[in-house]
A protein has these predicted regions:
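Short, low-complexity N-terminal intrinsically disordered segments enriched in polar/charged residues
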Residues: 19-56, 60, 163-179
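Hydrophobic pocket/interface hotspot
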Residues: 39-42, 53-55, 62, 74, ...
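Short beta-strand edge/turn micro-motifs at domain boundaries
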Residues: 130-160
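Positively charged n-region of N-terminal signal peptides that target proteins for export
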Residues: 1-5
Length: 181
C-alpha cells in the first residue's frame, strides 16, 4: 500500500512539474512579443503621422493588401500611400480594443477616430469619423511582410454617409427541431 502511495505521489509531482510553463510571463514567446512590439511601432507611425521609422517594422518587400486601389507593394510605396492617407484627416486617434500575437501573425482589433480635412469617401471637411477594424499582419524575422484590414460593411457605409440596407426578411421562421415529435 505504501508503495502505491509513493508511486501516486511521485506521479502527481511529475504531472505538476511538467505543467510548469517555461514561457515568459504573458504566455507569449519572445518572437511573438517582438512581432507585437513591431505592430505597436506601426500604429505609432500612423498616430504621429511620421513614417520615417516604418522600415524598422515592415520588410522592404512587404505587401499591404488593404490599399485603396488594391495591393501596395514595397516599403517605399507604403510610406508614400500612408503619408497621403494621414494628410486627409486631423486629430486622429487609435485605440487598441484587443490584440493577439503568435510567432507568425499579429491581429489587432482597433478603433480609429478623427476629423476629415478634405473631401474623401463621401465625407466632407470637418466630418468626424469613428470606425473599427481588425488589422492582421504576417511577420517574418520581426518585420511585417503582409497586412490585411477587415471592416464591418455597415460601419463603413455609415461613415461614408450611405445608409445600410434594411435587415433581411426572415422567410424561414424560427428554427424547428426535426428530431422531436
Amino acid at each position: 500500500m505504501k508503495k502505491l502511495q509513493i508511486i501516486l505521489i511521485t506521479g502527481c509531482l511529475f504531472i505538476i512539474a511538467s505543467c510548469n510553463s517555461k514561457k515568459d510571463a504573458g504566455g507569449m514567446s519572445a518572437t511573438a512579443k517582438k512581432n507585437l512590439e513591431a505592430m505597436h511601432g506601426i500604429t505609432k507611425c500612423f498616430d504621429s503621422k511620421d513614417f520615417s521609422k516604418l522600415g524598422d517594422f515592415i520588410a522592404e518587400d512587404g505587401i499591404d493588401h488593404a490599399g485603396e486601389q488594391g495591393d501596395i507593394k514595397g516599403l517605399a510605396n507604403m510610406k508614400a500611400e500612408f503619408t497621403k492617407m494621414v494628410a486627409a484627416y486631423d486629430d486622429s486617434k487609435t485605440e487598441v480594443i484587443k490584440e493577439l500575437a503568435d510567432d507568425e501573425y499579429v491581429m489587432t482589433w482597433q478603433r480609429y477616430s478623427g476629423t476629415m480635412k478634405i473631401e474623401q469617401m463621401g465625407m466632407k471637411p470637418g466630418d468626424k469619423f469613428n470606425m473599427s477594424a481588425i488589422e492582421v499582419s504576417k511577420f517574418k524575422d520581426g518585420k511585417a511582410v503582409e497586412h490585411w484590414t477587415f471592416m464591418e460593411p455597415a460601419e463603413m457605409m455609415k461613415m461614408m454617409g450611405t445608409p445600410p440596407p434594411p435587415p433581411m426578411e426572415d422567410k424561414m421562421g424560427p428554427a424547428k427541431d426535426s428530431t422531436s415529435k
